[in-house]
C-alpha cells in the first residue's frame, strides 16, 4: 500500500463531456505508486427519469482497486434505485425526489453497495482486502448535493472563491475517534489501529466485523456525509479530487490555479492535466485523479491572460537557456539545479496556487531540447525543497 516506483508513471487517462448546462473534464495519473487504484464516474443525464440530473465522483482505492472499480460502475445505480431515493405516486410512477429523499437515498445507496460487496467471494474470504474513499456531486436543476466518505474532497468555487468544501474523515477527528474507540479500536499515529489512514470508506471489511455493532458503528464506517447547496448563478466550478491532489494543494490554491488556467484554455482535459502535473512536481507521491465540473459562469478564456501566459513561457525559456549557457562552461547542470535557481528569482505572473511547479513542463521542455541526453529525473524527487516556498 506504500510501495513506490523508481520513476513516476506520468501517462494520463482523460475524458470530457457536456450536457445539462455543464461541461466536465477529468484526468488521472498513476504517479509514483506501484499500482493505479483510483477510479471515477461521470454521468451527464441520470437514466430513468432524471435526465436533467448529473453525477460525478472520484474513488481513491487502497490495498487494491477492486472496490474502487466496482463502485465507479455501480454506486449510482445503488443510489437511484433504492426506495428511499424516489417516492412513487399511487399508480407507481416515480416522482421527482425531494431534497430529503435524495440525501436519505444517497446514504442508503452507500450502505447497500457496501453490504452487497461484502458477499463477493474474494472480499469475503480475505483474498482481497481493498477499500475505497468516495467523493461526489449529484447536480439537479436546483441543487448541488455533495457526497463524501473518506479523505478525498470536493470544493465549490463561486465568485472566484472557495464557497464550500467537504470535510475529510480522518481517525483523529473527535467524532470519528469516538466511534472507533466505542468499537474497541484505537487511533495510533493518526490511523485506525495504527494501520488505516481513513475512518470512513467502502470495503475494508477487516475493520467492519465487530459483533453487536451496526454498519455505521464499526471501526470504519461506509456512511457518507451529504450536504445540499442551492445552485446560484455565481457558481463557477466544482473540483473533485483524491488526496494525491490535496496533499500538496490547499482548497484555495487549487481553486486559484484552476481559475487561472480556465482563463488561458477552454479545454477542460488540459486544465485537469495541468493540475495533475503541477501536483506531481509539488511532490505528490500518490495516485492522482481530478474531475472538474464547470457551470455556465465558469471563467472564460481571456486574450490578456493568454498573452500574459505566453510572455511568462518565453521568459522562462530564455532564463533556462541563460542558466544552461552560463553553467555549461563548468559542465551541464541537472534540472534540479536549474529549478533551484529559478525558485530563488522573483518571477512575475506565475500561475496562482501553482507557482513555479505550474510551469515545470515548460522548463523541462527547454532543458530537454538543450540537453537531450540528460535524464530530467521524471518527477519531483529532490525538487520538493526547492519549491516549498512557492
From Swiss-Prot:
Pfam families hit by this protein: PP2C, PP2C_C
Membrane topology, record value: Lipid-anchor
Record bears the keyword Metal-binding: yes
Cross-link (Glycyl lysine isopeptide (Lys-Gly) (interchain with G-Cter in ISG15)): 12
Residue positions binding Mn(2+) 1: 60-61
Annotated SMART domains: PP2Cc
Posttranslational mods: Isgylation negatively regulates its activity.
Transmembrane regions listed in the UniProt entry: none
GO biological process entries: N-terminal protein myristoylation; negative regulation of canonical NF-kappaB signal transduction; negative regulation of defense response to virus; negative regulation of interferon-beta production; negative regulation of non-canonical NF-kappaB signal transduction; positive regulation of canonical Wnt signaling pathway; protein dephosphorylation; regulation of canonical NF-kappaB signal transduction
Coiled-coil regions listed: none
Compartments where found: Cytoplasm, Cytosol; Membrane
Residues that, per the record, bind Mn(2+) 2: 60, 243, 286
Presence of keyword Lyase: no
Protein name: Protein phosphatase 1B
Organism: Rattus norvegicus
